[in-house]
């Protein structure tokens, strides 16, 4: 979960250089307009599953090893598309993932165990003259920055816990490749490949000990939240441009998930 995605020009937040910097929150999320998949942490699954398809994918492979397993809320049907923004650039969903909410702040790893707070200088809400200050008169973090640090710290901790869950999920070998296809009456279609989803048939072969362990830890609930969230794929397709004005009898066909056996996506 180290990808920056929505961040354009990150710099270390310096109490000397940025002593007078203020932030005026913007009422839009245009910074995420080109993000078709938003990283999630496991604690978000129950909320996110109500509105987003939760899917898995692999990061870049290292040598002959599979890439790290990651989890995302799917927000578009192709790269560079976010269907959860309205015409004014506002996030159009009840639940906004923490990855989005923490912007324009982010932790950057500057050492083996050292994290440094950074900001995206391109964020239009930063200003020296108006907004809430990041630092107080003594140069200490002001209320806004303290709140941002709390969110960053919690997200980092949850990301580590999520990583441990994903390693278990990967080792259990219960994932399969899948692709999402939405067909429209005018001949258009959307196809998303490289996704991984849990194979319910494979879950039946898990040992009783594993099932009991995952039940006790809450990880089994995460898997079922993921499976239930796949019902949002059709709702995602209906957010595509033009679908809202299509007459009801000719609405896009239900999004289908075509599944292929296999442990990793390409």
Task: Tell me what each language-model feature is.
Residues 106-266:
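A contiguous, surface-oriented mixed alpha/beta subdomain in the mid-to-C-terminal portion of proteins
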Residues 9, 33, 54, 58, ...:
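Intrinsically disordered, low-complexity regions enriched in small/polar residues
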Residues 49-51, 95, 101-102, 177:
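Short beta-strand-initiation
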């Amino acid at each position: 979960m180290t990808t920056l995605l929505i961040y354009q020009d990150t710099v270390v937040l310096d109490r000397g250089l940025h002593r007078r910097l203020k932030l005026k929150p913007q009422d839009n999320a245009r910074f995420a307009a080109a993000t078709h998949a938003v990283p999630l942490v496991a604690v978000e699954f129950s909320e996110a599953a109500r509105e987003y398809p939760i899917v898995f994918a692999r990061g870049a492979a290292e040598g002959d090893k599979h890439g790290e397993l990651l989890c995302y809320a799917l927000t578009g049907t192709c790269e560079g598309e976010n269907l959860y923004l309205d015409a004014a650039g506002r996030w159009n969903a009840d639940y906004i993932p923490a990855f989005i909410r923490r912007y324009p702040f982010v932790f950057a790893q500057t050492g083996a165990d050292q994290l440094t707070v950074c900001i995206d200088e391109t964020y239009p809400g930063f200003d020296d003259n108006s907004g809430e200050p990041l630092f107080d008169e003594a140069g200490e973090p002001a209320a806004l920055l303290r709140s941002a640090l709390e969110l960053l710290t919690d997200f980092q901790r949850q990301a580590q816990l999520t990583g441990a869950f994903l390693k278990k999920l990967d080792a259990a070998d219960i994932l399969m490749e899948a692709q999402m296809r939405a067909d429209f009456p005018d001949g258009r279609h959307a196809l998303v490949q490289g996704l991984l989803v849990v194979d319910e048939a494979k879950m039946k072969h898990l040992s009783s000990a594993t099932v009991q362990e995952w039940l006790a830890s809450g990880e089994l609930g995460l898997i079922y939240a993921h499976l239930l969230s796949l019902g949002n794929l059709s709702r995602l397709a209906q957010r595509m441009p033009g679908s809202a004005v299509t007459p009801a009898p000719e609405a896009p066909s239900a999004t289908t998930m075509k599944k292929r056996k296999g442990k990793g996506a390409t």
